[in-house]
């Protein structure tokens, strides 16, 4: 593969806007289809969603997908047809494996405050697995450490959540000004700036909503210029390479 580093600016994302939702899409999603922007590595969806108070997604189906949700502000209430329910808030990571099929709803838990969250989808190694749900508090780890592994299916990697994909993991970092982390080395990386401003070694400044897609790129550092939070997918395969 040819090594590439592609910066995608926040303003270039497609946007879905309704009376209660503003959803910014890093990849093709819903009515926004671009055949040249369907995925990177194994990552199919990276939606940056802001939901108005007392609103949300009514029950809807998913199948054969690993869905990770990360809340930036507010609280999101989850309920599904397998009997799982809970409120997700900043610092609490959630993974839902849709497997053979599941219905779930996602509602703003507040009647007065908006909720802001990022939802990310990757395919599992195999179709037809049993649907499952997992959530884990990792706020303390984010405050103590540089790069925290939020979810992973890569053998030997410790993570808060388990992914049913042996070639993918999601890392997060909450950085103070001046703090630096080293990005993982992998054939495919996807870096998303949840909030803040940072400098990417050899790549310039990044801000809220910006993303970087790495293909077979050299390791490099990422330094926060102000309080910042980033989400980084490490992927050792691309769509079509993973086990089925």
Curated annotation (Swiss-Prot):
Oxidoreductase is among the record's keywords? yes
Instruction: Please report a single Pfam family linked to this protein.
Output: Pirin_C_2
Which residues does UniProt call coiled coil? none
Q: Where is the signal peptide?
A: none
EC? 1.13.11.24
Q: Its annotated pathway?
A: Flavonoid metabolism; quercetin degradation
Report which superkingdom the organism of origin falls in.
Bacteria
What GO cellular component entries does it have? Answer: cytosol; plasma membrane
Q: Look up the record and name the cofactor or cofactors this protein needs.
A: a divalent metal cation
UniProt similarity note: Belongs to the pirin family.
The name on file for this protein is Putative quercetin 2,3-dioxygenase Rv0181c
Query: Organism, per UniProt?
Result: Mycobacterium tuberculosis (strain ATCC 25618 / H37Rv)
């Amino acid at each position: 593969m040819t090594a590439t580093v592609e910066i995608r600016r926040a303003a270039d994302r497609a946007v879905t806007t309704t009376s209660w939702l503003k959803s910014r899409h890093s990849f093709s999603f819903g009515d926004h289809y671009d055949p040249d922007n369907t995925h990177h590595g194994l990552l199919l969806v990276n939606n940056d969603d802001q939901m108005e108070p007392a609103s949300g997604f009514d029950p809807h189906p998913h199948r054969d997908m690993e869905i990770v949700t990360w809340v930036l502000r507010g609280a999101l209430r989850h309920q599904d047809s397998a009997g799982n329910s809970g409120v997700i808030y900043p610092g609490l990571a959630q993974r839902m494996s849709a497997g053979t099929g599941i219905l779930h709803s996602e509602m703003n838990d507040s009647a007065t405050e908006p909720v802001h969250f990022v939802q990310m989808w990757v395919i599992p190694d195999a179709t037809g697995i049993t649907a499952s749900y997992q959530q884990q508090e990792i706020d303390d780890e984010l405050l103590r450490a540089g790069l925290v592994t939020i979810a992973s299916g890569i053998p030997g990697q410790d993570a808060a959540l388990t992914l049913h994909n042996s070639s993918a993991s999601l890392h997060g970092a909450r950085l103070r000004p001046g703090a630096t982390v080293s990005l993982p080395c992998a054939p495919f990386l996807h870096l998303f700036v949840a909030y803040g401003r940072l400098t990417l070694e050899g790549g310039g400044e990044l801000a809220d909503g910006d993303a970087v897609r790495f293909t077979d790129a050299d390791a490099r550092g990422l330094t926060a210029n102000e309080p910042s939070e980033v989400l980084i997918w490490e992927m050792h395969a691309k769509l079509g390479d993973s086990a089925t």
